[in-house]
């Protein structure tokens, strides 16, 4: 048998895997080619500015540790406020490609020209490399959502979830910026995949939850979900087995990852945590005050108002190219150019968003019926879908009064899986109806 025949035989035996890899490659290529079309967000400048921490952390991480009584510079403030993964990831790739970082952080209180003169606008090459490095994580997320879908409802369901994630307008925008939303989404999906496997590896689960949490703190519900799933699976299979071991492993790895990536905590961890929490509360209070004055619709104080805004942003509203109007006049052309592409608004608005909401509700309504027919192996993935949705929704609705579309990114994997479930159920219903008509 020659090499050509061997390759052909291998491809026939691994057709599904080859098809999946090709699909992942095509979607990733599409995302990559569209990077220049994505409008600039000043927070990208901040992440690139802080990416200098990559080299600082390699050379002497102890210098990054915070000490009570010392002055809080802008860099120290960001280390206290923001998770470190994104800036370190960007720093690695900028260092590898020898691209510069901005000289100064972006100052929202100043005008566009003032920030440019200060050197806060990233070099085009640096911005592109930063965005590209975020897109490079996307294949992991696509692979993960396909496998979670397969564990829940089989191959057709997996492909529907794959398509819905890859074409989601919120994902298209926010995972092609040099910001935290891309890593947050990918590590969250990988965690769901690991939890859905027949045998859960607590070491890997602790690692991916640690990476997700250190991309964005709103992913913390993943930790609660993992602990619940590990307890549930271990207790169900063997009540006498010491389930505590797996939980301890997850917690230890999670804490080790967080400590390793946050040298700001190393010298005075408790005092630093208190300072970080206080800084986060002050920032949130300031944001609420600013947006309440500038755009009251961006602030939702009551739970019903937050539910309304959540549904509006994840289903109906166009991609939110910017949360604040500071630089709208300067960036308006880029906003309109981006939104002029139909693919960037796919399944949004009254019709598209209404269809996605209908698919999601259908998925929720048909779950009990499907669950009765599903094999026992799908019980845990379904529990992950239900438990994860409830936990993540509770945190977002209970903690986040600001209506920033990108703040809802942690819910996107669950939304995609619910909508895929509804669409798959609809296909099944129509298929059965067609077969009955055909037989007659």
Task: Indicate residue ranges for each PLM-predicted region.
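Hydrophobic, aromatic-rich transmembrane alpha-helices
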Residues: 140-145, 328-377, 438
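Perimembrane helix-loop-helix junctions
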Residues: 2-6, 193-203, 209, 221-256, ...
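Interfacial juxtamembrane loops and adjacent helix segments
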Residues: 49-133, 276, 281-347
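Transmembrane-helix signature of polytopic, membrane-embedded enzymes
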Residues: 16-23, 102-117, 145-167, 199-204
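Specific aromatic-rich, kink-prone transmembrane helix
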Residues: 144, 163, 183-200, 208-209, ...
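Transmembrane alpha-helix segments characteristic
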Residues: 22-25, 160-161, 352-397, 415
């Amino acid at each position: 048998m020659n090499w050509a025949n061997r390759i052909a035989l291998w491809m026939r035996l691994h057709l599904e895997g080859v098809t999946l890899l090709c699909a992942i490659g095509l979607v990733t290529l599409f995302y990559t080619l569209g990077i220049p079309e994505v409008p600039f967000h000043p927070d990208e400048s901040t992440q690139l500015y802080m990416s200098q921490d990559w080299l600082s952390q390699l050379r002497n991480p102890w210098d990054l540790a915070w000490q009570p009584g010392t002055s809080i510079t802008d860099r120290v403030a960001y280390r206290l406020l923001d998770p470190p993964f994104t800036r370190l990831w960007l720093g690695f790739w900028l260092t590898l490609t020898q691209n510069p970082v901005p000289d100064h952080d972006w100052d929202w209180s100043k005008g566009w020209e003032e920030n440019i003169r200060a050197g806060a606008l990233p070099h085009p090459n640096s911005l592109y490399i930063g965005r590209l490095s975020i897109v490079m994580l996307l294949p992991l997320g696509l692979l993960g959502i396909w496998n979670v879908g397969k564990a829940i409802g089989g191959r057709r369901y997996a492909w529907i979830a794959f398509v819905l994630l890859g074409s989601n307008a919120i994902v298209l925008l926010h995972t092609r910026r040099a910001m935290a939303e891309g890593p947050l989404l990918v590590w969250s999906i990988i965690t769901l995949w690991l939890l859905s496997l027949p045998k859960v590896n607590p070491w890997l689960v602790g690692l991916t939850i640690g990476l997700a949490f250190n991309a964005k703190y709103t992913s913390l519900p993943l930790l609660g979900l993992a602990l619940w799933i590990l307890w549930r699976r271990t207790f169900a299979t063997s009540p006498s087995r010491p389930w505590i071991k797996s939980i301890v492993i997850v917690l230890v790895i999670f804490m080790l990852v967080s400590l390793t990536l946050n040298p700001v905590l190393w010298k005075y961890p408790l005092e630093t945590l208190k300072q970080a929490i206080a800084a986060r509360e002050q920032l949130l209070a300031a944001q609420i005050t600013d947006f309440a004055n500038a755009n009251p619709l961006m602030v939702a104080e009551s739970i019903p108002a937050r539910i309304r805004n959540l549904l509006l942003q994840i289903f109906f509203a166009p991609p939110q190219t910017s949360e604040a109007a500071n630089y709208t006049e300067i960036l308006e052309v880029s906003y309109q150019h981006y939104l002029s592409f139909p693919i960037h608004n796919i399944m949004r608005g009254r019709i598209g968003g209404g269809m996605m909401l209908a698919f999601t509700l259908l998925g929720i309504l048909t779950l009990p019926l499907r669950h009765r027919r599903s094999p026992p192996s799908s019980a845990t993935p379904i529990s992950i879908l239900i438990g994860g949705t409830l936990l993540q929704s509770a945190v977002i609705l209970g903690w986040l009064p600001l209506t920033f579309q990108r703040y809802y990114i942690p819910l996107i994997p669950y939304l995609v899986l619910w909508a895929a479930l509804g669409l798959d159920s609809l296909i099944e219903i129509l298929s059965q109806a067609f077969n009955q008509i055909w037989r007659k």
